[in-house]
């Protein structure tokens, strides 16, 4: 399901305050976003959450669902050599072990693009 849901929070949650708009994205939307990250660029998960939210008219993206959906997006696209997940995670990110990704390959791709570890 490739849709965004925006909710106004009654109570603060994580780094999102009460009254702010919180985006609940999807694996598909996160995949689309990662595909568009330019070569040589790195985006932290926090920055990814903020940018996804702003594009959807929200203040921030839910950190819990972002983690889940990021893992799903990487899992669904990990065999696509054009899917640049290494621009969002480094070889030390917990999802690397969960999905049995090649740490050395991630490191090499980041070095090749000039992305610091």
Region annotations inferred by a language model:
Residues 1-2:
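N-terminal organelle transit peptides
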Residues 5-117:
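Nucleic acid-binding interface residues in structured DNA/RNA-binding domains
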